[in-house]
Amino acid sequence: MNRLLQRQLFLENLLVGVNSTFHQMQKHSINTCCRSLQRILDHLILLQTIHSPVFRLDRMQLRQMQTLACLWIHRRNHDLQVTLGAIKWISP
């Protein structure tokens, strides 16, 4: 299985598993490090999609999937280095 397919399957499975939890979380329950992580994500997604018309159309979906994935990873680790490694792995 190639890396792209592996990443896609990971994100799809994660999205299904975490979507309801994500929507139940209240804004104030996401702590400061998770909010910082979301800012990093927004910046990464912007950099990755700014020159690509195809990705521009998918930016919102990509942002939702990456945010879900990274919040899920981060809430279980609370280790920023591990989380940044995971972001690199799931980023296009």
UniProtKB/Swiss-Prot annotation:
TM helices/strands, residue ranges: none
Coiled-coil residue spans: none
Top-rank taxon: Viruses
Record's keyword terms, sorted: Host cytoplasm, Host mitochondrion
GO cellular component, as recorded: host cell mitochondrion
Family annotation (InterPro entries): Rotavirus_NSP6 (IPR006950)
Compartmental location: Host cytoplasm; Host mitochondrion
Predominant location: host cell
Entries under Pfam families matching the protein: Rota_NS6 (PF04866)
Similarity comment text for this entry: Belongs to the rotavirus A NSP6 family.
Assembly information from the UniProt record: Interacts with NSP2 and NSP5.
Name of the protein described by the UniProt record: Non-structural protein 6
Organism name: Rotavirus A (strain RVA/Pig/Mexico/YM/1983/G11P9[7])
